[in-house]
């Protein structure tokens, strides 16, 4: 259960987890922009799985921050 209430924008109600998802997506984008030039993806077996796991870890950390 999050500390933030449901937010209503133009008649659409957004649960607090929606904003946590957006924040984790923004951080994921920044982390990917840093990791690609460093060449880490050359050592990754399956980049799509790596990206999915990275996003899940970031979302978990951010959602734990707001609880």
From Swiss-Prot:
Main location (coarse class): membrane
Stated membrane topology is: Multi-pass membrane protein
Q: Which InterPro entries match?
A: DUF1656
Query: Where are the membrane-spanning stretches?
Result: 3-23, 47-67
Q: What induces it?
A: Positively coregulated with aaeA and aaeB by AaeR.
| GO CC term (a single one) | plasma membrane
Pfam families for the chain: DUF1656
Q: Which residues form a coiled coil?
A: none
- Specify whether rRNA-binding is a keyword of the entry: no
Location in the cell reads: Cell membrane
Q: Superkingdom, according to UniProt? A: Bacteria
Entry keywords, A to Z: Cell membrane, Membrane, Transmembrane, Transmembrane helix
User: What is stated as this protein's family in its record?
Assistant: Belongs to the AaeX family.
Its name, as the record gives it, is Protein AaeX
Q: Which organism is it from?
A: Escherichia coli O157:H7
Gene it is expressed from: aaeX
């Amino acid at each position: 259960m999050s500390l933030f209430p449901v937010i209503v924008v133009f008649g659409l109600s957004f649960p607090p987890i929606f904003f946590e998802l957006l924040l984790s997506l923004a951080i994921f984008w920044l982390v990917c922009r840093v990791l690609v030039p460093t060449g880490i993806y050359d050592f990754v077996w399956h980049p799509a799985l790596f990206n999915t796991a990275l996003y899940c870890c970031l979302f978990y950390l951010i959602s734990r921050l707001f609880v």
